[in-house]
Amino acid sequence: MKQFEGIKFIAFDLDGTLLDSVPDLAEAADKAMQALGRDRVTVEQVTTWIGNGADILIGRALSQSIELDPELDLALHQEARALFDRFYDEGGHKQSHLYAGVKETLAAFHQANIPMAIVTNKPAQFVPHLLEQHGISEYFVDVIGGDTFPLKKPDPFALHWLMEKHQLAACEMLMIGDSRNDILAAQAATCHVVGLTYGYNYGQPISASNPDVVLDQFSQLIDVVKLAC
């Protein structure tokens, strides 16, 4: 298995990488659709729709397809998004849970003094509470949401911002994610990238996006990142 040396910073996606959040996202999206008298959505559908941020998720729910309806009414879209945000917040994210090995692996990187960040397309307002709720907020020096900057993944803007802030060369940063947006962002930033097979990638294998390494379990990251003694 390939091993990365000289890694000084690790950036993580959130949904589908650290956290299985589909049940809560699907519930909020379904409630929003019901409130508007639209067709309901299922967990199975939402699993293939997430990864591009809440606006796109709700657009897909309204369109009942991964392809957005080009004639979708803007006012309806905005109302649906506001309802989704309300229901998602009111639900308290109680059905979401960390994947196996996440907390232990993050703790190991933290113990090895490797700074870490969250780079997610999820709206930033929801991220701090989720990290605190699952006891991992202390591990991250930066938390970047999908609306923190004007551009989100697959654009590399957030990764470039982190490299500039922490004075990193691209070869010193590692991105960990479960979708092609994560892989494309890392490749555009020319940093290393690991793709995880268990997350949400629009129903496609993550290997198709050609990450440097493909892993089936989060805990395997310890085997590919060479930690200082």
Swiss-Prot record:
Disulfide bonds: none
UniProt GO molecular function: metal ion binding; phosphoglycolate phosphatase activity
Tagged with keyword GTP-binding: no
Gene Ontology BP, a term: DNA repair
InterPro entries xref list: HAD-like_hydrolase_sf, HAD-like_sf, HAD-SF_hydro_IA, HAD_2, HAD_sf, PGP-like_dom2, PGPase_prok
Pathway: Organic acid metabolism; glycolate biosynthesis; glycolate from 2-phosphoglycolate: step 1/1
Catalytic reaction equation(s): 2-phosphoglycolate + H2O = glycolate + phosphate
Binding-site residues, Mg(2+): 13, 15, 178
SUPFAM superfamilies reported for this sequence: HAD-like
Known EC number: 3.1.3.18
Superkingdom of the source species: Bacteria
Top EC class of this enzyme: hydrolase
GO terms for cellular component: cytosol
Alphabetized UniProt keyword annotations: Carbohydrate metabolism, Hydrolase, Magnesium, Metal-binding
Catalytic residues in the record: 13
Cofactor list: Mg(2+)
Listed NCBIfam families: HAD-SF-IA-v1 (TIGR01549), HAD-SF-IA-v3 (TIGR01509), PGP_bact (TIGR01449), PRK13222.1-2 (NF009695)
Role of this protein: Specifically catalyzes the dephosphorylation of 2-phosphoglycolate. Is involved in the dissimilation of the intracellular 2-phosphoglycolate formed during the DNA repair of 3'-phosphoglycolate ends, a major class of DNA lesions induced by oxidative stress.
Similarity section: Belongs to the HAD-like hydrolase superfamily. CbbY/CbbZ/Gph/YieH family.
Protein name: Phosphoglycolate phosphatase
Provenance organism: Photobacterium profundum (strain SS9)
